[in-house]
A protein has these predicted regions:
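Amphipathic alpha-helical coiled-coil/heptad-repeat segments
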Residues: 91-141
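Short amphipathic beta-strand starts and helix->beta connectors
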Residues: 25-27, 69-73
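A short beta-sheet element
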Residues: 1-59
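Periplasmic-binding protein-like
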Residues: 63-67
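Residue-level recognition of specific faces of alpha-helices
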Residues: 22, 38-41, 78, 83, ...
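A short glycine-rich beta-alpha junction/loop motif
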Residues: 32-40, 50-52, 72-95
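ATP/adenylate-binding site constellation spanning eukaryotic-like Ser/Thr protein kinases
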Residues: 17, 60, 81-84, 126
Length: 141
């Protein structure tokens, strides 16, 4: 059970199933928690590699291509723990990592906000279409 315990800052990497390669950064609010065998726990040395930077790096197209190329496909797609351990990670100063994370985090916030607005606009469109088609709302031309 100890090997399956996750800590804040860990990265969870799906290694089995239809979602191979999906990742998540563990936040303090979900601790204590454990994983199952379909997830790899990636724990960085925080003195040389920021978890947030590693998270952003593992989301890149470069890593996705490597994972897609190396997964074995049987009943379910799989990636081995040794393959995860062999993924390349850039060696960049903590200062540069922090700058990159700040930029990417702000882009993620804007993207999330836009997605929420799109969902809301689709809901409004659906409501308006329903009102127009049912005759509850009339349009004068």
């Amino acid at each position: 059970l100890r090997r399956s315990q996750i800590l804040s800052g860990d990265i969870l990497f799906t290694i089995s199933g239809a979602t191979v390669g999906k990742i998540a950064l563990v936040k303090e609010e979900i601790i204590p928690a454990n994983t199952n065998q379909a997830l790899a726990i990636i724990r960085s040395n925080k003195e040389t590699l920021r978890p947030q930077f590693l998270y952003h790096w593992l989301k890149t197209r470069i890593i996705k291509n490597i994972v897609d190329k190396n997964q074995t496909v049987g009943a379910q797609p799989n990636v081995s723990l040794s393959q995860i351990g062999e993924l390349p990670v850039p060696s960049i100063s903590l200062e540069i990592q922090d700058q990159i994370c700040k930029l990417l985090d702000s882009i993620d916030q804007v993207t999330s906000s836009i997605r929420k607005k799109i969902i809301h606009l689709k809901y409004l469109r659906k409501s308006l279409m329903s009102d127009l088609l049912s005759g509850r709302t009339r349009v004068t031309i």
